[in-house]
UniProtKB/Swiss-Prot annotation:
It is found in: Nucleus. The keyword Ribosomal protein does not apply. This is Mediator of RNA polymerase II transcription subunit 20. Component of the Mediator complex. GO terms for biological process: regulation of transcription by RNA polymerase II. GO terms for cellular component: mediator complex. It comes from Caenorhabditis briggsae. PANTHER family: MEDIATOR OF RNA POLYMERASE II TRANSCRIPTION SUBUNIT 20, UBIQUITIN SPECIFIC PROTEASE HOMOLOG 49. Belongs to the Mediator complex subunit 20 family. Keywords: Activator, Nucleus, Transcription, Transcription regulation. GO terms for molecular function: transcription coactivator activity. InterPro entries: Mediator_Med20. The keyword Metal-binding does not apply. Component of the Mediator complex, a coactivator involved in the regulated transcription of nearly all RNA polymerase II-dependent genes. Mediator functions as a bridge to convey information from gene-specific regulatory proteins to the basal RNA polymerase II transcription machinery. Mediator is recruited to promoters by direct interactions with regulatory proteins and serves as a scaffold for the assembly of a functional preinitiation complex with RNA polymerase II and the general transcription factors.
Length: 198
Protein backbone atom coordinates (compact mmCIF):
# COMPACT_ATOMS: atom_id res chain seq x y z
CA UNK A 1 0.00 0.00 0.00
CA UNK A 2 1.25 3.44 -0.92
CA UNK A 3 0.02 6.91 0.01
CA UNK A 4 -3.70 7.58 -0.56
CA UNK A 5 -5.82 10.69 -0.99
CA UNK A 6 -9.54 10.08 -0.45
CA UNK A 7 -12.20 12.61 -1.44
CA UNK A 8 -15.88 12.90 -2.23
CA UNK A 9 -16.52 13.53 -5.92
CA UNK A 10 -19.32 15.71 -7.25
CA UNK A 11 -19.72 13.56 -10.37
CA UNK A 12 -21.37 10.18 -10.67
CA UNK A 13 -19.19 7.08 -10.38
CA UNK A 14 -19.67 6.42 -14.12
CA UNK A 15 -18.46 9.94 -14.99
CA UNK A 16 -15.32 9.48 -12.89
CA UNK A 17 -14.71 6.07 -14.45
CA UNK A 18 -15.02 7.56 -17.95
CA UNK A 19 -12.39 10.16 -17.04
CA UNK A 20 -10.06 7.40 -15.83
CA UNK A 21 -10.64 5.23 -18.90
CA UNK A 22 -9.95 8.29 -21.05
CA UNK A 23 -6.41 8.50 -19.67
CA UNK A 24 -5.73 4.80 -20.14
CA UNK A 25 -6.73 3.34 -16.78
CA UNK A 26 -7.23 -0.42 -16.67
CA UNK A 27 -10.07 -1.92 -14.65
CA UNK A 28 -8.46 -4.23 -12.09
CA UNK A 29 -11.50 -5.39 -10.15
CA UNK A 30 -13.81 -4.21 -7.44
CA UNK A 31 -13.31 -2.82 -3.97
CA UNK A 32 -15.34 -2.28 -0.84
CA UNK A 33 -14.98 -0.19 2.30
CA UNK A 34 -17.35 -0.21 5.24
CA UNK A 35 -17.53 2.20 8.16
CA UNK A 36 -19.53 0.91 11.13
CA UNK A 37 -20.15 2.95 14.29
CA UNK A 38 -20.33 1.21 17.66
CA UNK A 39 -21.88 3.48 20.27
CA UNK A 40 -21.69 3.21 24.07
CA UNK A 41 -24.71 1.25 25.38
CA UNK A 42 -25.61 4.20 27.60
CA UNK A 43 -24.97 7.69 26.23
CA UNK A 44 -21.91 9.15 27.90
CA UNK A 45 -19.43 11.93 27.39
CA UNK A 46 -16.75 9.75 28.96
CA UNK A 47 -16.78 7.11 26.23
CA UNK A 48 -16.48 7.84 22.55
CA UNK A 49 -18.03 6.04 19.64
CA UNK A 50 -15.75 3.35 18.25
CA UNK A 51 -15.67 3.24 14.46
CA UNK A 52 -14.87 -0.16 12.97
CA UNK A 53 -13.79 -0.23 9.33
CA UNK A 54 -12.79 -2.73 6.67
CA UNK A 55 -11.09 -2.23 3.30
CA UNK A 56 -11.02 -4.93 0.65
CA UNK A 57 -7.34 -4.19 0.03
CA UNK A 58 -6.68 -5.56 3.53
CA UNK A 59 -9.22 -8.40 3.71
CA UNK A 60 -7.88 -9.96 6.92
CA UNK A 61 -7.73 -6.70 8.88
CA UNK A 62 -10.13 -4.63 10.92
CA UNK A 63 -9.42 -0.98 11.63
CA UNK A 64 -10.71 0.60 14.82
CA UNK A 65 -10.67 4.33 15.51
CA UNK A 66 -12.25 6.33 18.34
CA UNK A 67 -12.35 9.75 16.68
CA UNK A 68 -11.29 12.76 18.73
CA UNK A 69 -10.47 16.25 17.51
CA UNK A 70 -7.82 15.11 15.04
CA UNK A 71 -6.00 12.05 13.77
CA UNK A 72 -2.92 12.34 15.98
CA UNK A 73 -4.85 12.18 19.29
CA UNK A 74 -7.49 9.64 18.25
CA UNK A 75 -7.01 6.15 19.70
CA UNK A 76 -6.67 3.69 16.81
CA UNK A 77 -5.70 0.11 16.15
CA UNK A 78 -5.26 -2.43 13.39
CA UNK A 79 -6.56 -5.88 14.32
CA UNK A 80 -7.27 -9.16 12.62
CA UNK A 81 -10.87 -9.92 11.62
CA UNK A 82 -11.36 -11.75 14.93
CA UNK A 83 -11.86 -8.31 16.47
CA UNK A 84 -15.33 -8.24 14.90
CA UNK A 85 -16.23 -11.38 16.87
CA UNK A 86 -15.01 -9.83 20.10
CA UNK A 87 -17.16 -6.75 19.51
CA UNK A 88 -20.25 -8.96 19.45
CA UNK A 89 -19.41 -10.10 22.97
CA UNK A 90 -19.13 -6.50 24.17
CA UNK A 91 -22.79 -5.72 23.45
CA UNK A 92 -23.25 -4.63 27.06
CA UNK A 93 -20.82 -1.76 26.49
CA UNK A 94 -20.83 -1.12 22.75
CA UNK A 95 -23.87 -1.36 20.49
CA UNK A 96 -23.59 -1.54 16.71
CA UNK A 97 -25.29 1.35 14.93
CA UNK A 98 -26.54 -0.41 11.79
CA UNK A 99 -28.44 2.69 10.70
CA UNK A 100 -25.18 4.67 10.70
CA UNK A 101 -23.21 2.14 8.65
CA UNK A 102 -21.73 3.49 5.42
CA UNK A 103 -20.69 1.11 2.64
CA UNK A 104 -18.63 2.14 -0.35
CA UNK A 105 -18.63 -0.25 -3.31
CA UNK A 106 -17.08 0.28 -6.68
CA UNK A 107 -14.28 -0.36 -9.15
CA UNK A 108 -10.52 -0.29 -8.83
CA UNK A 109 -8.36 1.00 -11.68
CA UNK A 110 -4.63 0.95 -12.34
CA UNK A 111 -2.96 3.78 -14.22
CA UNK A 112 0.54 3.26 -15.64
CA UNK A 113 1.42 0.76 -12.86
CA UNK A 114 2.18 3.43 -10.23
CA UNK A 115 -1.34 4.70 -9.53
CA UNK A 116 -4.38 2.90 -8.19
CA UNK A 117 -7.70 4.73 -8.25
CA UNK A 118 -10.80 3.38 -6.53
CA UNK A 119 -14.20 4.85 -7.40
CA UNK A 120 -17.18 3.84 -5.31
CA UNK A 121 -20.75 4.73 -4.55
CA UNK A 122 -21.39 5.34 -0.85
CA UNK A 123 -24.65 4.06 0.59
CA UNK A 124 -26.27 4.21 3.98
CA UNK A 125 -28.82 1.44 4.08
CA UNK A 126 -30.58 1.75 0.74
CA UNK A 127 -29.85 5.47 0.33
CA UNK A 128 -27.09 6.62 -2.01
CA UNK A 129 -25.04 9.28 -0.23
CA UNK A 130 -22.37 10.15 -2.78
CA UNK A 131 -19.31 9.06 -4.73
CA UNK A 132 -15.96 8.52 -3.06
CA UNK A 133 -12.62 8.40 -4.89
CA UNK A 134 -9.37 7.05 -3.47
CA UNK A 135 -6.19 7.92 -5.37
CA UNK A 136 -3.20 5.85 -4.26
CA UNK A 137 0.39 6.42 -5.33
CA UNK A 138 1.97 3.00 -4.88
CA UNK A 139 5.77 3.53 -5.08
CA UNK A 140 6.21 5.33 -1.74
CA UNK A 141 4.91 5.36 1.82
CA UNK A 142 6.37 8.78 2.69
CA UNK A 143 3.85 11.62 2.36
CA UNK A 144 6.33 14.46 1.89
CA UNK A 145 7.88 12.62 -1.07
CA UNK A 146 4.69 12.55 -3.10
CA UNK A 147 2.04 14.96 -1.81
CA UNK A 148 2.79 17.69 -4.39
CA UNK A 149 2.83 15.15 -7.21
CA UNK A 150 -0.47 13.69 -5.98
CA UNK A 151 -2.03 17.17 -5.89
CA UNK A 152 -0.84 17.72 -9.46
CA UNK A 153 -2.19 14.32 -10.55
CA UNK A 154 -5.61 15.06 -9.06
CA UNK A 155 -5.62 18.53 -10.60
CA UNK A 156 -4.72 17.18 -14.05
CA UNK A 157 -7.13 14.24 -13.98
CA UNK A 158 -10.15 15.78 -12.24
CA UNK A 159 -9.49 19.52 -12.66
CA UNK A 160 -10.64 20.03 -9.05
CA UNK A 161 -10.33 18.57 -5.53
CA UNK A 162 -6.57 19.28 -5.46
CA UNK A 163 -6.91 22.23 -3.07
CA UNK A 164 -8.59 20.24 -0.29
CA UNK A 165 -5.72 18.05 0.83
CA UNK A 166 -6.35 15.40 3.48
CA UNK A 167 -5.56 16.36 7.07
CA UNK A 168 -2.64 13.91 7.20
CA UNK A 169 -1.01 15.72 4.25
CA UNK A 170 -1.26 19.07 6.05
CA UNK A 171 0.09 17.97 9.42
CA UNK A 172 3.00 15.90 8.12
CA UNK A 173 6.20 17.87 7.57
CA UNK A 174 8.76 15.19 8.40
CA UNK A 175 9.36 12.07 6.34
CA UNK A 176 6.98 9.85 8.33
CA UNK A 177 5.66 6.51 7.13
CA UNK A 178 2.12 6.51 5.83
CA UNK A 179 -0.07 3.62 6.92
CA UNK A 180 -3.43 2.16 6.01
CA UNK A 181 -4.83 3.75 9.18
CA UNK A 182 -4.17 7.13 7.54
CA UNK A 183 -6.36 6.06 4.62
CA UNK A 184 -9.07 4.75 6.92
CA UNK A 185 -9.11 8.06 8.83
CA UNK A 186 -9.89 9.80 5.54
CA UNK A 187 -12.75 7.38 4.87
CA UNK A 188 -14.01 7.94 8.42
CA UNK A 189 -14.12 11.71 7.92
CA UNK A 190 -15.95 11.39 4.61
CA UNK A 191 -18.42 8.89 6.09
CA UNK A 192 -19.20 11.34 8.91
CA UNK A 193 -20.06 14.02 6.32
CA UNK A 194 -22.09 11.61 4.21
CA UNK A 195 -24.20 10.52 7.20
CA UNK A 196 -25.37 14.13 7.60
CA UNK A 197 -26.51 14.37 3.97
CA UNK A 198 -30.23 14.02 3.32
Amino acid sequence: MGVSWVFEAEQTAKSVERILEGIGAELMGQFQVDVIPYNPATPSTDYATNIVMHHSKCPQSTFSICPKTDFRVSPKAVCDRGFDLILGKLAGGLVIDNAGKIEINGNEYNIHSDWTVRVGTATQGTTVKGVVVEVEYDPTVIIVQCREMMAEFIKQVFNKYHETQPEIFKITEKPERYSTLDTMWQYLQIAAKLRKKT
